[in-house]
A protein has these predicted regions:
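Acidic, glycine/proline-rich low-complexity segments that act as flexible tails and inter-domain linkers
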Residues: 1-87, 101, 105, 252-257, ...
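A generic, well-ordered mixed alpha/beta core segment in the N-terminal half of proteins
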Residues: 79, 83-140
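Short amphipathic alpha-helical face segments that pack within enzyme cores
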Residues: 38, 93-97, 285, 289-292
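Short acidic alpha-helix initiation/capping motifs at coil-to-helix transition points
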Residues: 1-2, 14-17, 32-35, 113-117, ...
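Glycine-rich anion-binding loops and their surrounding alpha/beta cores
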Residues: 7, 59-65, 87, 102, ...
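A generic alpha-helix surface/boundary motif
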Residues: 17, 92, 117, 121, ...
Length: 330
């Protein structure tokens, strides 16, 4: 690690293979916490390269406990986090709405690091069982249309990093990696990212795979469609800009999509929205993100996807998916 750190401090970059090997050695426990923290800090001070990101991704995918759910042709809706916006759990809510619309979802998530309440914090509070057992996950996706893949159960190699990330409490390159390392290897993916540079990297890396994808970055900084302005999109064959009017709705203010300050408050907001008791702004932002997921899988327009999502939310199908998952978890 000393040699790697010296190279990085001298503004060198790692090859794809070097990057992969560093992560493999971290996973094996070959480095101490100070060395790992120093390594992570380098990437807070300079941009990661595509080669480095690809190497880190390859290491995590090679080391993960893979689960085959390909028969369901699922999608994952996952943001990098780290946008500093502290919204409510939009992509997790959108995942249940997407499932309610009949599109199968393998939701990859984790506890919050740079936000007070990540996807897994809310799921755990609501009684969702975290499991890496194939039978349970298949039963979940069969009966609820969605299964939750809690990252630490599938990436045991990262147990050496989790406490350091928690102590640092700022975004690291692991935020960038999260959506790329879903252990179900879903063929469909919605990824929200915290800056345009990362959107380009994701687009480049995904174009070299067989994934059907849409990368999202709200131009005012959100790692999802926020409806507070325009959103950059990169998909398999196109790039574009989405505006609120493309979903048939008006723009909203940042304050209208603020999240809870505690897990309890976040869970309350989550349930209120799924019950159809959310504000118009909350409902629309959830349905815009779910709508893009539905559009990505079914090959329809964002507006058509949005309408399907709205029907799922307001008819209670999204809530039904959550309730089913809760029952299976009991």
């Amino acid at each position: 690690m000393k040699e790697i750190l010296n190279r990085l401090i001298n503004h060198d970059i790692l090859t794809k293979e070097d990057a992969k090997q560093v992560l493999v050695k971290i996973a094996k426990g070959e480095y101490n916490t100070s060395q790992i923290a120093a390594f992570l800090t380098v990437y807070m001070m300079r941009s990661i390269t595509i080669e480095e990101l690809e190497g880190f991704r390859n290491a995590l995918l090679e080391l993960c406990l893979a689960i085959d759910l390909s028969e369901y042709n699922p999608i994952d809706l996952c943001g990098t986090g780290g946008d500093g916006k502290d919204t409510f759990n939009i992509s997790t809510l959108a995942s249940f709405v997407t499932a309610g619309a009949g599109v199968k979802v393998t939701k990859h998530g984790n506890y919050g690091v740079s936000s007070p309440c990540g996807s897994s914090n809310v799921m755990e509070f609501l009684g969702i069982k975290f499991s890496n057992e194939s039978a349970f996950l298949k039963k979940s996706i069969d009966q609820a249309g969605i299964c939750v893949l809690h990252a630490p159960l599938f990436h045991p190699a990262m147990k050496n990093v989790a406490p350091i990330r928690k102590e640092l409490a700022v975004k690291t390159f692991f935020n960038m990696l999260g959506p790329m390392v879903n252990p179900a290897f879903p063929k469909n993916q919605i990824v929200g990212v915290f800056n345009l540079e990362l959107a380009r990297m994701y687009g480049y890396l995904y174009q070299n795979t067989d994934k059907n994808f849409t990368v999202l970055h709200a131009l005012d900084g959100y790692d999802e469609i926020s409806l507070t302005g325009a959103t950059k999109t990169i998909s398999n064959n196109t790039e574009g800009i989405l505006h609120p009017k493309d979903f048939g709705v008006k723009g909203i203010e940042q304050s209208q999509i603020a999240g809870g300050e505690t897990i309890e408050e976040s869970a309350r907001i989550f349930i209120e929205i799924l019950k159809g008791k959310g504000t118009e702004a909350q409902n629309n932002v959830v349905c815009a993100n779910a709508g893009i997921a539905i559009a990505t899988v079914n090959g329809v327009s964002p507006k058509e996807g949005f309408e399907s999502a709205k029907e799922s939310l307001l008819s209670g199908k999204g809530l039904k998916a959550l309730n089913k998952l809760q029952a299976l978890s009991a």
